[in-house]
Regions:
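Non-catalytic cap/lid and distal C-terminal segments of serine-dependent acyl enzymes
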Residues: 1-151
């Protein structure tokens, strides 16, 4: 399905009351991630993979100049993307499921991991987070996170 210009792939939506994990990906459908998650037999999981992310904008909480020659700057569009998640994307995902999930988590790696943690400070739609190798180095993030309160 396509919502707000993002391709969304949902795996395991037949699992009623399963936990819902939302992953933002640079590109791809996340089938391999879902297959790996299926190895955890004791927990029913639904995975929603959102692709076509503008990585240097939507995953970043602030601006950052290019890190190396030929790199693009980060433009700090995370708050706008969070509003899209709240208003359109997550409701569309929930409408596709065969029941309400036990909880909704967000997971990400690199800038996606930074975004996952940042989102806990900005929205109540996620009650769990996983950040794999999150970009905690992002300029000003540690200071910013020390000033914000999680909902």
């Amino acid at each position: 399905m396509i919502v707000e210009g993002k391709h969304i792939y949902i795996y395991g939506k037949e699992n009623t009351k399963a936990l819902l994990v939302i992953v933002n990906t640079f590109q791809g459908d996340g089938h391999e991630v879902y297959e790996a998650m299926q190895q955890i037999k004791s927990i029913p999981i639904t995975l929603a993979v959102i692709s076509d992310i503008d990585w240097n904008d939507e995953m970043t909480p602030g601006k950052c100049p290019p890190l190396y020659k030929g790199d693009s700057p980060c433009t700090g569009g995370a708050d706008g993307y969070i509003r899209k998640l709240e208003d359109k994307i997550v409701p569309a995902i929930l409408a596709e499921l065969n029941g309400q999930p036990s909880f909704v988590a967000i997971a990400g790696y690199s800038l996606g991991g930074l975004f996952a943690i940042y989102s806990l400070y900005k929205t109540e739609i996620f009650s769990r987070v996983a950040s794999a190798s999150g970009s905690m180095w992002f300029p000003g993030f540690l200071d910013l996170s020390g000033k914000m309160k999680c909902w």
